[in-house]
From Swiss-Prot:
SMART domains: WD40. InterPro entries: Cro/C1-type_HTH, G-protein_beta_WD-40_rep, NB-ARC, P-loop_NTPase, WD40/YVTN_repeat-like_dom_sf, WD40_repeat_CS, WD40_repeat_dom_sf, WD40_rpt. SUPFAM superfamilies: P-loop containing nucleoside triphosphate hydrolases, Pentapeptide repeat-like, WD40 repeat-like. It comes from Nostoc sp. (strain PCC 7120 / SAG 25.82 / UTEX 2576). This is Uncharacterized WD repeat-containing protein alr2800.
């Protein structure tokens, strides 16, 4: 918020009126001044019709501003536009106010004006402040300080420390409201603008960040590293010290100025020793390294207390220093008062007033409002009253106490909500927070009152509070809720004896208060305010938890003695809520549920039936047997059943987001609330791509079932299914007129379809490999297609002719996108690059390098200025299309990023990943706004121990589960992997289990202890398969990095790397004698390796798609393979001849297994079946039906009597080989197992379907 300080202007106006009668009443900008006005407006990103100038100008002129758009007296939209046009002179007062709004000196921009050196007012370079004009600045949420008073001595001191004396760490200390933040921003601005600082002394990078919401130190370090490395560091260490070391590397190589504001937020409240808040201890390690390690950069902290451990590094001649800030001087304080209006006081009275409040700028602003509103600007009257002791001031909190006591009930409620929201909120958002319906007029009046008192601020984003005010109100909220809970049945602790007997006293108090009606406690904040908002932006909700909810729990523990007592109290509150109306109970039910969860109470079996439960955040929370029958669950957030998500698209108006995944579903979400609105079911295999029609009425999807489907966005009904492709369909795109749809397929063709009747209009041929993506040009005349043949083809849509083939990539071209202005085409490739093309000429204009893995998806922003890319390296990069540099790298996904999409307004980015999450990002700040997470316990690989005792299953929940398969009893889980587990194998002696994961590691586990004793880390991509050598001393692993590795399990040493496959290795098997190893690959081949020499001694080719598994028969004479071409093949591997092809599956075949005698073969398929085959005849004996999702694996028991199968329906099934009957179903408890949602309200049908899939009952 702009520091409101305009006394020079006010003095000038008064002097003009009463002294200098000859002053000109109108002013006009000179041509040079007009250019500066336009530049200043452009730097702020304001359009001519932007109304943010209105509020600021109103404040400066001292007239009332209104939210509803009514212009204040003397200020009109026409005057503002005439000022910007510069053709006519306008009212002098308005001219000066408008200049001040833009941070300009009116004397220098007026016609016939003068230019002079200025000290603290706007400078020629100040206009560009908070813009992107400096090539290496990132201001984050830094406030505008274009209006600034005094502090010249402090500025000079700190500037000297930074630029001349090479200080590494500087702490600006002072009480809340003293001006630390403003000084830090002004300092950075002056360093940029100063012509007296030599280039060698000036920082090359300046970054400003606020710690107000206590972000994890790892997140702050990631932001700093990305910025200082020019977005080149993508592989950040998961360890704190690794990130610190990487940051120090950048601080040594370049001169950097880092400013971290509000550092008191990471310190324990009320602790003058500067100890760190729980969870923020890593900041101490970070600051220690900055202080004691040699580098050429400077970190500036602003804080109310000095962080612990820094004092020992400080000294007048040492590179670590601190500067305590005191209040403003008298003259500076008087100028601040002038912003608020007219005040009458003698020099002595001014001195007394400013001295009494220590020159604290925030305190003076608040007091000025009181004097203006209650004493008509008469300082002497105020001083007379204050001498009676009603305005005692030792700390800013004292002043806020006095102000808070004088607020109306509605004003207090607004203050609480602004503290909870943590960032600016609009009037509509604030109104929606209230349980009661507050008329907009009353809300506006209260907001206006609070704004006049300087208790709240208004920015372009809405209403908020200064950090010191927000902290005060948050603490007040916590104290008030604690008091309310005591009134509801708890007693205050009074010494050790009472602490010991608290349980009995609590019980007694329950009896005493049991008869009290809920309304007897007035209107508790516990019911009127949500302690956290489940649907808030992710980073806001995390700060609500760490700064409101968790401190409240800590205080309750102090009050009540134990978590059990807290739990008892909350249960008692629930009983008092039941039977009351939503208006009476408000947010209490949701608050109880959130408190119980974050107090780590096991919620199993809790009764929330018949209650209003709003704003409960329940993603990832076990709710086994919880009763929500007949409850109102509005605004609650639950876990989703998302698979690996492959694509995302915004609707044309930006209100909806569609996603599709490997669960064969298309989902439609409401962006603002995060609600799941629709689940479109109909595809029979992975859904690869989704896109909205230009009018937003139709959703098109395509997938591995070779179909394209059209859905009604209104109700999720499938309108048409377009058939004709003979392979997976990877991409679809609507023509701009919405009448034609293009589809790209693995059958190497593109088809154009008529949307109305579903007929295929044209089939475009020319690519020699899978066509991965299609996109129409903005004018609809050209279609671009990209393929696995490394090329891009441009087609004339009307004639179906190939106009041009673009060749430059060296890998699959996975994505293409036209810029909105139609000037360029971008392409993303498996060669890890992005290329920008002039598609009219075929010239490659630029190649973007930075990703360390395949680029899967790209998208232009609506204004064509930014290109976004998503990659297999798990990052999202934003590229400036004018400078062609990476301006931001977004981290957070833990697996490959498959799809990226800009919202229509260009402000939000949607990204989806194989980590089963959808994330929305703020494009400007890089903050994650919202994330939807899937929770599915897929059973991926299964394996019997050779001793028949245990069945193991690997899951996408990152664990290996051990089962007593004969009884169906779950034994335990092996935890340690950080991603999906795709391969498991037992050692021949059953003592060791190996697991392979998409976290690129292989782990070896001791089955008896459940401990991991070896981690193998040399693969550079997902590890799909692991197998033990028959002698048990060596394992082989296969990876998406296209290599097979052989390992010594005792030492963890990699013995050999076999690397002749051209695509990922999906399956492996040893020959019974251990001499050969077979590897199955997505390159459609099986290779046979001599394990002693590492040479490839044979290749089996015959499948027409990815080969998922290859296994030797027990006698070693034949090999069986399976593929996504829906077949199983039997081979004479010595001759390289296919003996049989087993057909019958109607979808991909993922896994096969021989019975111990080699006579039977089992196969697992995406068609949800297991088939039992006679190896000799090739006939199918049994089709085992029961799974409700794809079957990913099969394994025979050592005695060959049963087969186990693992499925994405989250079950393992045991089948009788002779009969095909299902004998046993093994399933771990799902997240919401047994949760009763009978009669619930506030949830969409899609969400209810999801809850049922996770175990809920209805």
């Amino acid at each position: 918020m702009i520091l409101q300080s305009t006394s020079l202007f006010c003095k000038y106006i008064n002097n003009c009126r009463y002294i200098n009668r000859e002053i000109v009443a109108t002013l006009k900008a000179s041509p040079q001044g007009l250019a500066r006005i336009k530049q200043a407006r452009s730097d702020r990103g304001w359009s001519v019709d932007d109304f943010r100038w209105l509020e600021l100008a109103s404040e400066i002129l001292g007239v009332c501003w209104q939210e509803n758009g009514v212009l204040a007296a003397g200020i009109s939209e026409g005057t503002w536009k005439r000022f910007l046009a510069g053709k006519q002179a306008i009212n002098a007062e308005a001219f000066k106010a408008y200049c001040q709004v833009l941070g300009l000196n009116w004397e220098e921009v007026q016609e016939g004006g003068r230019t002079k050196e200025r000290k603290d007012t706007g400078t020629s370079r100040q206009e560009k402040f908070l813009s992107s004009s400096h090539p290496h600045t990132d201001w984050g949420e830094a406030p505008d300080v274009s209006i600034f008073y005094g502090r010249s001595e402090e500025l000079d001191t700190v500037k000297r420390w930074v630029t001349q004396e090479n200080c590494r760490l500087i702490t600006l200390l002072g009480m809340g409201g003293i001006g630390k933040t403003t000084l830090s921003v002004k300092l950075a601005q002056e360093i940029i603008n100063s012509e007296k600082i030599y280039l060698s002394q000036s920082p090359e990078y300046i970054i400003w960040r606020s710690l107000r919401n206590a972000p994890p130190v790892e997140d702050i370090l990631a932001e700093l590293i990305q910025f200082l490395s020019g977005q080149q560091e993508t592989n950040l260490s998961n360890h704190l010290q690794g990130r610190i070391s990487l940051l120090l590397k950048n601080l040594r190589s370049s001169r950097c100025l880092i400013i971290l504001d509000n550092a008191e937020s990471i310190l324990q409240a009320g602790d003058r020793n500067g100890r760190y808040r729980a969870g923020c201890e890593g900041y101490g390690q970070f600051l220690q390294c900055i202080a004691e390690t040699s580098h050429q950069s400077c970190l500036i902290l602003t804080s109310r207390e000095k962080p612990q451990g820094l004092a020992k590094y400080e000294g007048d001649s040492l590179p670590v220093r601190s500067l305590p800030l005191t209040g403003l001087q008298e003259q500076e304080g008087r100028e601040l008062f002038n912003v608020k209006g007219k005040f009458a006081a003698s020099c002595d009275q001014w001195q007394v007033l400013i001295s009494r409040y220590g020159g604290n700028p925030l305190a003076l602003k608040i007091v000025a409002s009181s004097i203006r509103d209650f004493f008509d600007g008469d300082v002497s009257q105020f001083l007379e009253v204050s001498q009676q002791g009603t305005f005692i001031f030792d700390d800013i909190r004292d002043l806020l106490d006095q102000q808070f006591q004088r607020l109306t009930t509605l004003e207090r409620e607004i203050m609480y909500w602004l503290a909870i929201n943590r960032e600016p909120v609009t009037l509509a958002e604030l109104q929606a927070d209230f349980v009661a319906n507050i008329p907009p007029r009353e809300l506006l009046e209260s907001l206006s009152s609070l704004q006049r008192r300087s208790l709240i601020e208004k920015s372009a984003g809405g209403f908020t509070q200064q950090p010191v005010v927000m902290e005060y109100v948050s603490n007040h909220l916590i104290e008030q809720v604690c008091e309310e809970m005591r009134e509801w049945g708890l007693v205050r602790s009074r010494g050790a004896e009472e602490q010991r007997s608290r349980g009995e006293k609590i019980h007694t108090q329950y009896k005493l208060n049991a008869a009290l009606p809920l309304t007897a406690l007035s209107t508790p904040l516990f019911t009127t305010h949500a302690l956290i908002k489940a649907q808030a932006k992710d980073y806001v909700r995390e700060s609500q938890i760490s700064l409101i909810l968790q401190p409240l729990i800590n205080q309750l523990i102090t009050e009540f003695g134990s978590l059990e007592n807290i739990s008892n109290c909350l249960v008692h509150i629930l009983s008092r809520l039941r039977g009351k109306s939503p208006q009476e109970t408000g947010y209490a039910g949701g608050n109880v549920l959130n408190l119980l969860h974050h107090a780590q109470v096991d919620l199993s079996g809790y009764d929330f039936s018949g209650l209003t439960v709003w704003q409960a955040y329940l993603q990832g929370v076990n709710l086994h047997d919880v009763d929500f029958a007949n409850s109102d669950l509005s605004c609650c957030v639950f876990t989703e059943t998302l698979g690996n998500i492959l694509s995302a698209a915004f609707s044309p108006e930006g209100q909806l987001l569609a996603t599709c995944d490997t669960d064969c579903h298309v989902r439609v979400w409401e962006v603002k609330s995060g609600k799941l609105l629709l689940i479109c079911r109909g595809h029979s295999n992975w859904v690869r791509f989704v896109v909205f029609s230009p009018d937003g009425e139709i959703l098109a999807s395509c997938g591995a079932d070779e179909n394209v489907k059209l859905w009604s966005v209104r109700d999720g009904v499938c309108i048409k299914t377009l058939t004709g492709h003979e392979h997976e369909v990877f991409s679809v795109a609507f023509h701009p007129d919405g009448e034609t749809l293009a589809s790209a397929s693995g059958d190497k063709t593109i088809k154009l379809w008529d949307i109305q009747d579903g007929t295929c209009l044209q089939t475009l041929t020319g690519h020699t490999d899978w066509v991965r993506c299609v996109a129409f040009s903005p004018d609809g005349n050209t279609l671009a297609s990209s393929a696995a043949d490394h090329t891009i083809k441009l087609w004339d849509v009307s004639q179906g002719k190939c106009l041009r083939t673009l060749k430059s990539h060296t890998g699959w071209v996975r994505s293409v996108a036209f810029s909105a202005d139609g000037q360029t085409l971008a392409s993303g490739s498996g060669d890890r690059t992005i290329k920008i093309w002039n598609y009219h000429t075929g010239e490659c204009l630029k190649t973007y390098i930075g990703h360390t893995n395949s680029v899967y998806s790209i998208a232009y922003s609506p204004d064509s200025k930014i290109l976004v890319s998503g990659s297999g390296d798990r990052t999202i990069k934003l590229w400036d299309c004018q400078t062609h540099i990476c301006i931001k790298t977004l981290h957070g996904h833990t697996n490959e990023v498959c799809s990226v999409a800009f919202s229509p307004d260009g402000q939000t980015l949607a990204c989806v990943s194989l980590d089963q999450s959808v994330r929305l990002w703020n494009c400007r700040t890089g903050q994650c706004l919202k994330a939807w997470y899937g929770n599915t316990d897929w059973a991926l690989p299964v394996a019997f121990s050779p001793d028949r005792q245990i069945l193991a299953s690997g899951s996408n929940d990152k664990t290996v589960k051990l089962w007593d398969w004969q009884t169906g009893k779950y034994i335990s889980s092996l935890e340690g992997h950080t991603d999906f587990i795709y391969g498991i194998a037992f050692s021949p002696d059953s003592q060791t289990l190996a697991s392979a994961s998409t976290d690129s590691s292989v782990r070896l586990w001791n089955i008896s202890t459940g401990q991991c004793f070896q981690i193998l880390l040399e693969h550079t991509d997902w590890v799909y398969a692991v197998v033990f050598h028959p002698q048990g001393k060596i394992i082989a692993t296969g990876s998406a990095d296209c290599t097979v590795k052989l390992w010594n399990i005792s030492t963890g040493q990699c013995l050999k790397t076999l690397s002749e496959h051209s695509d990922k290795i999906l399956g492996m098997a040893w020959s019974p004698d251990g001499q050969l190893l077979a590897s199955a690959s997505a390159d459609q081949s099986v290779r046979l390796w001599d394990c002693c020499t590492g040479r490839c001694v044979g290749i089996l080719r015959g499948h027409s798609n990815r080969v998922y598994s290859a296994i030797f028969s027990p006698n070693g004479e034949i090999i069986a393979t399976c593929s996504t071409d829906q077949t199983v093949k039997i081979w004479d591997w010595q001759q390289g001849k296919c003996l049989k092809t087993l057909t019958g599956h109607t979808n991909w075949v993922f896994d096969i297994a021989f019975s111990p005698d080699g006579k039977i073969l089992a196969s697992a398929s995406h068609d949800q079946t297991v088939r039992i085959w006679d190896v000799n005849t090739g006939k199918c004996h049994h089709i085992c039906i029961g799974h409700t999702h794809l079957v990913s694996s099969v394994a025979f028991s050592p005695d060959g009597e049963v087969v186990a199968s693992g499925s994405q329906d989250q079950t393992v099934r045991i089948w009788n080989v002779k009969t095909g009957e299902c004998l046993q179903i093994l399933r771990a408890k799902r997240l919401y197992e047994g949760m009763n949602i009978t009669g619930v309200t506030g949830l969409t049908k899609a969400t209810i379907f999801t809850l049922q899939a996770l175990g809920a009952l209805r």
